[in-house]
Regions:
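Intrinsically disordered, low-complexity segments enriched in polar/charged small residues
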Residues: 8-12, 100-102
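Bacterial N-terminal signal peptides
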Residues: 3-5, 12-27
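Flexible, solvent-exposed loop/hinge segments and secondary-structure transition points
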Residues: 32-177
Length: 177
């Protein structure tokens, strides 16, 4: 009798063998990774943004008077257009305004005010490629940035640059739902 009871405690049940095997197999197999999907501004959308800026305030007759930069969700240039009368620095200014707006998810003029003087955020101005000038506007789908647009050289300075950039984003507003 003692032999039987010893044998019954040593021989595991079929259910416990299966459970143990499944546990080891699951622990040994790598987790199933899923691709990370992120929305981004398309080339067609970037073109439409540029066309929206040009239609709103970018032309003086047949000349393009503003410089426009559209960046993607990573802040990389997607489309850039230098105005016919642009100064050499305008292209870089437009790109940096777009980058600043995209990075901080707010118009660059608003960001400039938030980081001015003795603000606790003033150190952000030391980051590479940001610029505390108006003319950059983020391109958002809800709370998710998919890009930014920056304008430089509009008649009326930075507030006009920002208004032009907003007109560019408005040109694709129906696609940002």
């Amino acid at each position: 009798m003692s032999r039987l009871s010893f044998r019954s405690t040593v021989v595991p049940s079929l259910a416990s063998v299966i459970l143990t095997t499944v546990t080891f197999v699951m622990a040994a197999s790598p987790a199933q990774a899923q691709a990370l999907l992120q929305r981004n501004i398309s080339a067609a959308q970037a073109m439409a943004v540029v066309e929206g800026v040009l239609a709103s305030c970018g032309r003086d007759g047949t000349r393009v008077i503003v410089t426009i930069a559209v960046v993607d969700r990573a802040g990389q240039p997607r489309l850039m257009l230098a105005g016919d009368t642009a100064s050499p620095h305008n292209l870089d200014l437009a790109r940096r305004k777009a980058y600043t707006a995209r990075t901080f998810r707010r118009p660059s003029l608003e960001w400039a005010a938030r980081t001015a003087g003795d603000s606790p955020r003033a150190g952000q101005r030391q980051l590479t490629d940001v610029i505390p000038l108006g003319g950059g506007v983020p391109i958002m789908i809800g709370d998710e940035p998919i890009g930014g647009v920056g304008v430089s050289g509009a008649v009326g300075g930075q507030p006009a640059d920002e208004a032009c950039a907003m007109a560019g984003v408005a040109a694709i507003a129906d696609q940002l739902q």
